[in-house]
Swiss-Prot record:
A single MF term (Gene Ontology): metal ion binding
Name of protein: Gamma carbonic anhydrase 1, mitochondrial
Gene name of this polypeptide: GAMMACA1
Organism of derivation: Arabidopsis thaliana (Mouse-ear cress)
UniProt keyword Zinc present: yes
Residues bound to substrate: R86, G87, D88, Q101, D102, N209
Region annotated Disordered, chain positions: 256-275
Entry membrane topology: Peripheral membrane protein
Amino acid sequence: MGTLGRAFYSVGFWIRETGQALDRLGCRLQGKNYFREQLSRHRTLMNVFDKAPIVDKEAFVAPSASVIGDVHIGRGSSIWYGCVLRGDVNTVSVGSGTNIQDNSLVHVAKSNLSGKVHPTIIGDNVTIGHSAVLHGCTVEDETFIGMGATLLDGVVVEKHGMVAAGALVRQNTRIPSGEVWGGNPARFLRKLTDEEIAFISQSATNYSNLAQAHAAENAKPLNVIEFEKVLRKKHALKDEEYDSMLGIVRETPPELNLPNNILPDKETKRPSNVN
């Protein structure tokens, strides 16, 4: 953003603030008789001056998440409820097929004791568990960060590495490929098995599929939501004995339509042989 662009941005900001100030003044003049509607000012995507998030159209960002500033989110990735990705003083990059689960925090480092500037780089097909904290670190492809883990400035988790739940990984630590680290401070625990390495990729795939269902549900307009409420009320099931006493035969409720890759394939029921 050049000098002229920043000037226009500042003027627009002042005009908006003036309007809000006039609204507050009018409310005070009305005394106890005024009505003020409480609106949430939460923004899922928010710029910081000229730094704006870039989110792939195939990615899912939950409505209650906050993606702020210089953040790039790749194809098929999912940012879940309550997450904060804050790229205000540096860059946050999230690859493809990665999931950052509920209430996690991803931030960047502009200054620290070592004097180094660290962006946060998260690779492809990474799983980051609930309430994890990533600060100025690098997480390579197909890694697993457990719930509540904390990764500090300069940490590097190599491909197929795993950080256990609740671990605290100190600054400038490097976790080699195929190893599990845990504890406070985190230290080497053991090698991953082949099955565990395969699980890392499968976990990312499962979350990408699940995100499609959440994206479809969150995209529904109000009229569709209200119509589905009526349908659910209509098809509410009561106790079979209660229905039989009243002689009621209820309609079978419709099945919830999910993408084919969300639920495991159901075996087709074969008709019983007729003797």
